């Protein structure tokens, strides 16, 4: 029996394992996971009964195969959630689906509310054409935004960097208000230094024109209109956070006979004289082990993959070594309440603001976003009625001053910024805090990234290596696109296809903007 060795037990790795075990019965599957949990950046951390979502993950896809896969692992709710019952909110339920009040293995339908906090005022994320928006802007700023956008329509800049891409989409004024500082805070680089392709993937074709179409489509109730995924108003979400999906998947993989080795860091991959991988070496419990395999599916960072491989030519080695990443830190803060006033028409427990997360556009703080876990799922919080569980999100570099902080030091900064933003009155109201860190959370689009095609060519030449997922391809994929790279890899393994173009082309800009015969099948998703 042939053996597939899969590096990483995140969305891409576990999807590949499950697909192989259900579609290729003659292949043994072994998964190596560096940490002690599943899901990668999509994991859920349980701290004293309060759960944290690393980065916030909405599940929304227009790829039928992905939706069917999710439904198989976590069936859609067949009865209301706790907060919908208490608040008498109407949300769709699926006949015959599990009751989230009685069962855990269930996917919920949740409201999408994300806003920008700018100059102490709330704005929709993405910006929408509502009276409140213009009221917040004031007459002068509204005029500046309008004329700035008109100027960008008639004078297009070359889209050779992210700054020009955003200015072409939104005009210089909106760019300076809502994109410039946030992007620099996120990546640690000014947008003028970042490749434009990141914007194309993450804004999903969104622009002022797209916002106008959405506005008038709602106004006149246009049927069958195409909805840009950055504008979706509902999404799926696992009852116990995104990590639950991957915990369930891991259990299914093991049930099907797959092996998962946790706390196993893959450090080396060994090629023979024919440029074919023969084995890998991993560290576990302070010891080194080597395992032979026939197929190697990697979701580990490309930089580490190539760095651990023997006999790599100088050029691909240099490109891989220069690939940049941004790391992530979050501080869970438990408080009795937050000061933000709910002025929306969406009911919530204790009338807290309904946002899943809020983008912070304030040059006086380091904080990039904060999540309100109560609104993702009522089952994420131990005491929903009496506490609010906030996740403060910071974008950092491994080894910098933030990354090296103790939890106490990090909490002091995070809580002080909550006070500065008016979220709480004093540090004294904080009931508890918890810090989490994620290495290489975001593959970045600068430095040697513009030479990525040459690295892809080299990796594709290793016939039994399949690179999948966000870090496996150094591409800012959403969960569904990461899964599709694994679908494609498994198809190639089963069919014996040597060409890897189908795997690497998932969520490329060209394919991303293609339109199928059925608009609802366009390959887009919103999972952040």
What is the role of each PLM region?
Residues 2-31:
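N-terminal Rossmann-like FAD-binding beta1-loop-alpha1 element of flavoenzymes
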Residues 12, 37, 303:
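Conserved Rossmann-like nucleotide-cofactor binding loop
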Residues 21-47:
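Glycine-rich FAD pyrophosphate-binding loop
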Residues 23, 238, 262-404, 408-409, ...:
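Mid-domain catalytic core of redox enzymes
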Residues 48-152, 204:
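Dinucleotide-binding Rossmann-like beta1-alpha1 core, especially the glycine-rich loop
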Residues 131-133, 137-138, 142-270, 278, ...:
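Active-site/ligand-binding neighborhood in enzyme catalytic cores
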Residues 156, 294, 298-305, 401-410, ...:
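Conserved mid-domain beta->alpha element of the FAD-binding
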Residues 435-439, 445-528:
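C-terminal lid/capping helical subdomain adjacent to the catalytic/cofactor pocket in oxidative enzymes
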């Amino acid at each position: 029996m042939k053996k597939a060795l899969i590096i990483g037990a995140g969305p891409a790795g576990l999807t590949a394992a499950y697909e192989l075990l259900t579609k290729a019965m003659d292949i043994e599957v072994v998964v190596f996971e560096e940490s002690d949990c599943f899901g990668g950046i999509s994991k859920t951390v349980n701290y004293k009964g309060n759960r944290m979502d690393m980065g916030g993950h909405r599940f929304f896809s227009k790829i039928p195969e992905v939706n069917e896969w999710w439904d198989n692992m976590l069936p859609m709710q067949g009865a209301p959630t706790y907060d919908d019952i208490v608040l008498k909110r109407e949300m769709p339920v699926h006949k015959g689906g599990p009751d989230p009040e009685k069962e855990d293995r269930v996917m919920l339908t949740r409201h999408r509310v994300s806003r920008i906090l700018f100059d102490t005022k709330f704005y929709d994320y993405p910006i929408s054409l509502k009276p409140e928006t213009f009221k917040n802007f004031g007459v002068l700023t509204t005029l500046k935004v309008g004329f700035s956008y008109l100027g960008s329509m008639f004078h297009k800049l070359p889209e050779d960097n992210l700054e020009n891409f955003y200015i072409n989409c939104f005009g210089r004024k909106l760019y300076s208000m809502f994109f410039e500082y946030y992007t620099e805070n996120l990546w640690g680089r000014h947008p003028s230094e970042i490749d434009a392709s990141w914007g194309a993937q993450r804004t999903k074709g969104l622009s002022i024109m797209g916002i106008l179409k959405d506005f008038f489509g709602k106004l006149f109730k246009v049927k069958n209109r195409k909805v840009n995924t950055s504008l979706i108003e509902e999404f799926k979400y696992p009852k116990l956070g995104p990590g639950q999906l991957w915990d369930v998947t891991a259990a299914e993989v093991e049930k099907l006979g797959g092996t998962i080795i946790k706390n196993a860091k893959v450090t080396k991959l060994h090629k023979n004289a024919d440029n074919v991988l023969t084995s890998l070496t991993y560290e576990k419990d302070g010891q080194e082990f080597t395992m032979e395999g026939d197929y190697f599916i990697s979701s580990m960072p490309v930089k580490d993959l190539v760095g651990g491989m023997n006999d790599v030519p100088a050029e691909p080695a240099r490109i891989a070594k220069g690939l940049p990443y941004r790391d992530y830190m979050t501080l869970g803060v438990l408080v009795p309440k937050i000061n933000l006033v709910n002025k929306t028409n969406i009911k919530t427990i204790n009338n807290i603001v309904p946002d899943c997360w809020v983008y912070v556009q304030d040059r006086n703080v380091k904080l990039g976003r904060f999540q309100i876990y109560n609104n993702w799922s009522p089952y994420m919080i131990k005491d929903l009625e009496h506490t609010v569980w906030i996740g403060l999100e910071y974008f950092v570099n491994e080894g910098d001053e933030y990354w090296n902080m103790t939890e106490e030091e990090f909490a002091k900064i995070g809580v002080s910024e909550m006070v500065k933003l008016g979220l709480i009155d004093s540090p004294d109201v904080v009931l508890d805090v918890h810090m989490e860190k994620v290495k290489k959370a975001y593959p970045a689009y600068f430095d040697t990234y513009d030479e990525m095609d040459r690295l892809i060519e080299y990796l594709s030449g290793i016939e039994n290596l399949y690179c999948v997922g966000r870090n496996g391809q150094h591409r800012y994929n959403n969960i569904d696109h990461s899964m599709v790279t694994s679908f494609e890899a498994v198809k190639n393994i089963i069919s014996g296809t040597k060409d890897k173009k189908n795997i690497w082309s998932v969520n490329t800009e060209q394919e991303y903007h293609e339109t199928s015969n059925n608009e609802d099948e366009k390959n887009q998703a919103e999972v952040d």
